[in-house]
Structures are given as structure tokens and as C-alpha cells.
């Protein structure tokens, strides 16, 4: 069921719940008042029912991709086949049609909505957030919500992908998001949140707490301790089902501390 969240943004939840996806992937549907067309952010996985529900909403000229993970990108070819949409992302592997790669600071006008692209690497190297406002407003203002994808979740904290994610980049991205002030958070998983400034500050504090715990663990376990050893020492407050994910974030913390 398509659920309105703001004047411009509605969410269609994919039925792919899990440890990493929470209730499932949030596919965001952006449409200005009176517009027949819509912009999709993250079509989700290759799920025929989900893609069918999206395609049935109406004309979709443009799909934007927040980052490379399959739970956000797997449905690209299916939605293009159904709608003929142009697909834009940072990575060239996800481009479809003639739109070209997305760039930091770029502004897009489509479906009666103004969308500003913001590079927020860390979770992955290609992670983006999208500021959403209405057409005709002056640049830099009027964006009432931010689609944060997996950089800020609706519940819990984000894993740093050890393939190409970076804690240093992630902390800088959180600081950039914090600087946007009190805007609505429309995440890639979990419920929407009311205050980006507050939640990004909490994320930064959480990361600093974990870094201090890792520093303490290294003093006890030795400087050569593995990420798994540190997880077993530090993450005693976390369900063991999440330890594999915690190991990725801990490896990112070790890489950060070891330079």
C-alpha cells in the first residue's frame, strides 16, 4: 500500500524484511501536487509483486538510485521494462537511458518536485542522500525532507560495508547531514523520523562511543586483535544474530583507528 508521508513523498514498502532490511526496503515515490508523473527513489529488490505495484501507480519517467546494494537496485531492469524510465545513479553499472551519472550538488526538477543530490559516502562509497522540495523555491531553501537511504535508518544504526565503505567518510557525511538542520528523515529502511539534526547527532555520538569501546578493547586484547575478537568483547549488548554485521562495522573502526 502506498503510504503518504509528506506533501511530496510517499513510501511503498517492499516485503523483504530481515536483519539488515528491518521491515523491508522503502521505495520512495516523489510527486508534486497535480503531477501525473512521479520519480522513484530505489525500486528495491527484484520482486515481481513490488515492481508491479510500483509500475501500476502511473507514469514513471525517472528512477534515482541511492547506492549499489541489491535490496535497493535489484528491481532496476524490471521497472525499466515496465515503465521505460531513465535510471540515474553514481555508479555507471546502474545507468539506464540517457540520464548520466548523478553528481553531488546537482538539482533535478521532475514530476513537480525539486530534488538536490547530496553525496553521503560511508555506508558504501557511492551512497547518496536526496533533499526534496517543490519547484520554484530558491536554491538552498525549501527542502523539507531528506531521503537518507542507508546512511541514516529509521531504527538502529548503519553498517559500514567493508568492500568500499569508510568510517572516515561516514562520519563526515553525518556531519554534513547534521548541518542541514531539523528536517524530516525519509530512510531506506524503517520508519520516518522528524529531526535529522538530532538523529545525526545521536549517530555521531554512538560512533564515538563505539570507537572508545574499540580503543579500550585493543588495550585489553592487544593491538593486533581481530574484528571478531573485538565484537565478542564490545558488542555484548547486541543480539548475536547481528554480530556478523557488527564485525563489518568493527573492521571499519579498526581501519579508521589504524590509519
Where are the language model's segments positioned?
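C-terminal regulatory/interaction regions
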Residues: 217-259
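Divalent metal-coordination and catalytic microenvironments
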Residues: 8, 30, 42, 67, ...
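Hydrophobic "anchor" residues on beta-strands that sit immediately upstream
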Residues: 38, 63, 114, 119, ...
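Conserved beta-strand hairpin/beta-sheet module of binuclear metal-dependent hydrolase folds
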Residues: 2-56, 129-149
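Glycine/small-residue-rich loop that forms an oxyanion/phosphate-binding "nest" at active or ligand-binding sites
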Residues: 87-100
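Active-site metal-binding motif and surrounding structural segment of the metallo-beta-lactamase
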Residues: 45-89
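Active-site metal-binding loops of divalent metal-dependent hydrolases
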Residues: 15-16, 43-45, 68, 92, ...
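Divalent-metal (often Zn2+) His-rich catalytic cores of metallo-beta-lactamase-fold enzymes
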Residues: 138, 167-221
Amino acid at each position: 500500500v502506498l503510504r503518504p508521508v509528506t506533501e511530496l513523498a510517499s513510501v511503498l514498502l517492499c516485503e523483504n524484511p530481515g536483519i539488515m532490511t528491518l521491515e523491508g526496503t522503502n521505495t520512495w515515490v516523489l510527486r508534486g501536487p497535480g503531477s501525473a508523473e512521479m520519480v522513484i527513489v530505489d525500486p528495491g529488490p527484484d520482486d515481481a509483486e513490488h515492481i508491479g505495484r510500483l509500475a501500476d501507480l502511473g507514469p514513471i519517467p525517472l528512477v534515482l538510485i541511492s547506492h549499489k546494494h541489491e535490496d535497493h537496485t535489484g528491481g532496476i531492469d524490471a521497472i525499466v521494462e515496465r515503465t521505460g524510465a531513465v535510471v540515474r545513479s553514481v555508479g555507471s553499472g546502474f545507468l539506464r537511458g540517457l540520464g548520466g551519472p548523478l553528481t553531488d550538488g546537482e538539482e533535478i526538477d521532475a514530476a513537480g518536485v525539486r530534488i538536490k543530490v547530496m553525496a553521503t559516502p560511508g555506508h558504501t562509497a557511492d551512497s547518496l542522500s536526496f533533499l526534496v522540495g517543490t519547484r520554484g523555491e530558491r536554491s538552498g531553501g525549501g527542502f523539507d525532507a531528506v531521503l537518507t537511504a542507508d546512511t541514516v535508518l529509521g531504527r538502529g544504526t548503519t553498517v559500514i560495508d567493508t568492500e568500499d565503505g569508510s568510517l572516515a567518510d561516514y562520519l563526515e557525511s553525518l556531519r554534513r547531514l547534521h548541518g542541514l538542520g531539523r528536517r524530516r528523515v525519509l530512510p531506506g529502511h524503517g520508519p520516518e523520523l522528524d529531526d535529522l539534526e538530532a538523529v545525526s547527532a545521536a549517530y555521531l555520538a554512538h560512533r564515538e562511543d563505539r570507537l572508545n569501546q574499540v580503543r579500550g578493547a585493543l588495550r585489553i586484547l592487544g593491538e593486533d586483535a581481530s574484528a571478531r575478537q573485538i565484537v565478542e568483547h564490545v558488542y555484548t549488548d547486541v543480539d548475536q544474530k547481528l554480530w556478523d554485521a557488527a564485525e563489518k562495522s568493527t573492521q571499519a573502526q579498526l581501519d579508521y583507528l589504524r590509519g
